[in-house]
Amino acid sequence: MLIIETLPLLRQHIRRLRQEGKRVALVPTMGNLHDGHMKLVDEAKARADVVIVSIFVNPMQFDRPDDLVRYPRTLQEDCEKLNKRKVDYVFAPAVEEIYPQGLEGQTYVDVPGLSTMLEGASRPGHFRGVSTIVSKLFNLIQPDIACFGEKDFQQLALIRKMVADMSYDIEIVGVPIIRAKDGLALSSRNGYLTAEQRKIAPGLHNVMNSIAEKLIAGNRELQEIIAIAEQELNEKGFRADDIQIRDADTLQELTETSKRAVILAAAWLGQARLIDNQSVTLAQ
């Protein structure tokens, strides 16, 4: 496994891979890797000849400076995990390598609508930062496929739209959420939880299951369903942030013709903002 930190060396290897006709898969990450990331790697390995994992804590997508400062940087441990998985390349650039002129005046990629709704409304600039760094990685690495987790449901939808709108010839693969045995979705931010909070954390998934059962039973009183769910979360020790029930295919409000719903939930538990989602097939 080769660790690459500079753009010239990356471009050199990408040119060689292209000349050799290799099928390249990209797994973009911010490091602090867990089993959910490893599932992305496994999916990439199954679909390509060469796997490149990027590790870059992207300052452009953080809406709070304190969150950027305390985000875990675990490059050595991450590389050890990826080496065991027989990843071919790790691209781990410094911020100055990606944004040599700094963020001030930086050209960015924005995806209208999807970047400012739902999660984007509560985290201004976040999705603009995501689409910009992913676009830069696509331009640098020129992958045939790229793997993203379905845990970040809106992010995946945003990347798919960006790829379509910008005519990237890249297959976007969504990989299902990996959960702990108690149902908690794996996330780098779970590390912020205390031992006591970790016991409470699966409650978010349990509340989403309750919402799903109501939708499957035909209940469409969405505001009431959401209000009850928020109350349940608060009673469990969470601070409910946002719960939405949307059309899973468009992320717009549910209509009578919607075939699938997605429950999008975000809640604070101590210093950790946990997000999760669940898709539900609706009775027609």
From Swiss-Prot:
Pfam families, A to Z: Pantoate_ligase
Gene Ontology molecular functions: ATP binding; pantoate-beta-alanine ligase activity
GO terms for cellular component: cytosol
Keywords from the UniProt entry: ATP-binding, Cytoplasm, Ligase, Nucleotide-binding, Pantothenate biosynthesis
Active site: 37
Catalyses which reaction(s): (R)-pantoate + beta-alanine + ATP = (R)-pantothenate + AMP + diphosphate + H(+)
Entry-linked InterPro entries: Cyt_trans-like, Pantoate_ligase, Pantoate_ligase_C, Rossmann-like_a/b/a_fold
Binding annotation for beta-alanine: 61
Residues engaged in binding ATP: 30-37, 149-152, 178, 186-189
Family: Belongs to the pantothenate synthetase family.
Cross-referenced HAMAP family: PanC
Function text: Catalyzes the condensation of pantoate with beta-alanine in an ATP-dependent reaction via a pantoyl-adenylate intermediate.
Official protein name in the record: Pantothenate synthetase
Organism: Salmonella agona (strain SL483)
